[in-house]
Every structure is written in C-alpha cells, then in structure tokens.
C-alpha cells in the first residue's frame, strides 16, 4: 500500500472522501461521528496505538509553541479528551478563558469527565468547526489536534478558525501527516495491517481503526496544508515535522 495524495478537500461534485471511500458530502459528518462515538471511551488508547505513544510528546511540543499566558482566551477545537485544554487552562490561569469544543458529544463527555476528575471546570460546546458559535476576533489562540483531517470542508474550517482569532493571535494545527519517503513502506504496512488488527483486539473495532489509517493518507501533505492556511488569510505560516513527518505541527498568525 502506497501513500495516496489528495487535493485540499479532494472531492468530486457533491462528494468527498471518507477514508478511501467516496461519499456524499452530507453523509461524511455522520460517518465520522459513528467512528468517534465508537472509539470515544478508548480514544487515548487509539492515539497510543496510532502513534506508539508519541502523541503525548507531540502535544507537549504544541503546548510549548502555543505559549499561552495568564489572561489569554483559548479555543481548543475537536478537543477530544481534553489534553490540550487542560494544559492551556493551567497556563491561562483564573483570569483566562479556555473553551473545549468538539462536534461529537461522546468525545466531549469524556473530556468533561476527565477535566472534572482533575479539578477543572471549563466551558464546553458541541459545535461544528465550519460554523463556530463565537464572535469575530475573540481568541488569542486556537488549536486543533488530530481533528482537521476528519472535517468535510477543511478550507471552511480554517477560515472560521482565522475569523475568531484576534489580530496577533495564533492558530496551531497538530495532525498526522506525510511521513518521510524512506519510512513510507514500513509505516503503510503498520497502518493497514497492524493498526486494524490492534483495533480489533483492543477495542473490538477493526473498521474504525482502518478508517482512521485511511483518513491520514487522504489528508493534505505538509506543504498543501500550509498553502491552505495562507489562502484563508493567515500569515507567518510554518510547520514542524515531528518524528520524520508522522505528524506535523502547522502554525499561522492572524496579522490583520
């Protein structure tokens, strides 16, 4: 199995991709929701399997690059189990405001419960990243970790993220990306053979894990995503390859 390339939102008229399948655009959100309802309770296990535990290191790098300071307003989109939101809240302090959002209520409940267990109560919202329910120029930081690749219209979501950023605010996108070519055969073998097998054994859910592997291959590569961020009006766009490109952190700043 070779890496497949994709256009920014590779789709034909009225269709988009769900993993390697072509589906009507209106169906993708429901199909993705089914996957994450299925994996919500074991989401951290899923990320450990997909990244060999390295997602924790990548998130720590993202938190450092975010440079959240006391009093800042931060939006964590597709926040899952709340890892980033928890770290941002500690840095923003009582004078700050950190929102945890996700389109999937099962994921958001897991995040809420884990934050509460850790003594944190944060504002939560079930919302679509393509239609954020926040005012213009409200947040100092916006983050999305391992969520952008599941969105139907990535360009619309990125435009919304820019809209809610204050001038000088930063967007951080952490996502599985295009691995360095020498590692691609081994990585593909792991993704399409080992990962679904582990999903079946650990979570009794081979299909969801196969979709997640396919969704990584269909996600835009590093340079394409950087161009998409520039196209919606973000400046100072750059990215950092993590673990030879298994993941990448993209950054962009709203200047005006």
Curated annotation (Swiss-Prot):
UniProt keyword annotations, A-Z: Menaquinone biosynthesis, Methyltransferase, S-adenosyl-L-methionine, Transferase, Ubiquinone biosynthesis
Keyword Signal found: no
Catalytic reaction annotation: a 2-demethylmenaquinol + S-adenosyl-L-methionine = a menaquinol + S-adenosyl-L-homocysteine + H(+); a 2-methoxy-6-(all-trans-polyprenyl)benzene-1,4-diol + S-adenosyl-L-methionine = a 5-methoxy-2-methyl-3-(all-trans-polyprenyl)benzene-1,4-diol + S-adenosyl-L-homocysteine + H(+)
Residues engaged in binding S-adenosyl-L-methionine: 81, 102, 128-129
One Pfam family of this chain: Ubie_methyltran
MF terms in GO: 2-methoxy-6-polyprenyl-1,4-benzoquinol methyltransferase activity; demethylmenaquinone methyltransferase activity
Biased composition (Polar residues): 1-19
Sequence segments annotated as region (Disordered): 1-24
Record InterPro entries: SAM-dependent_MTases_sf (IPR029063), UbiE/COQ5_MeTrFase (IPR004033), UbiE/COQ5_MeTrFase_CS (IPR023576)
Keyword tRNA-binding listed: no
Known EC number: 2.1.1.163, 2.1.1.201
CDD domains: AdoMet_MTases
Pathway entry: Quinol/quinone metabolism; menaquinone biosynthesis; menaquinol from 1,4-dihydroxy-2-naphthoate: step 2/2; Cofactor biosynthesis; ubiquinone biosynthesis
Gene Ontology BP annotations: aerobic respiration; menaquinone biosynthetic process; methylation
Recorded family membership: Belongs to the class I-like SAM-binding methyltransferase superfamily. MenG/UbiE family.
Its job: Methyltransferase required for the conversion of demethylmenaquinol (DMKH2) to menaquinol (MKH2) and the conversion of 2-polyprenyl-6-methoxy-1,4-benzoquinol (DDMQH2) to 2-polyprenyl-3-methyl-6-methoxy-1,4-benzoquinol (DMQH2).
Protein name (database record): Ubiquinone/menaquinone biosynthesis C-methyltransferase UbiE
Organism this protein belongs to: Bordetella avium (strain 197N)
